[in-house]
């Protein structure tokens, strides 16, 4: 499990699926046998690092009620699709129990990699700040985040791509991706 922790620490904020890594480690090294506590520990580290890195912006959000209400709204709409998919569909369980999980994970890695390669073309034309995001855009980014429930789809990568595709500047897309990651990762 130490190898998984090191891998997660190195790749967590790269647009690479950490759940995909866990699937691969589990299949290649079945003796590692990660349990729920190990995975929860990895999530806690992720949460702390997001909050610490963005602490100034997060405190700024909490310092103004109008700003707080706006961010609360776009966070709720940004996580709602993942909550619905995670709670009410058996897709995740079917994928996790599939004998073809390594193939699914590989296809997901490839698909997301291709999209990320072309993302820079999109990013150069983006002009929207996070304060200009609409509820519909937040929900669309949330739909993208729901796809990250599949191993091999990076949550940060797919939400970053969706936000940039919808016009957010890259820095704001990254911040929003991390912001909606806090409750999503906490819920996982």
What are these regions (language model features)?
Residues 8, 74-79, 105, 141, ...:
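Alpha-helical transmembrane segments of multi-pass membrane proteins, especially transporters
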Residues 3-5:
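Short, small-residue-biased leader/transition segments that mark boundaries at the very start
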Residues 19-38, 157-180:
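Interfacial segments of multi-pass membrane proteins
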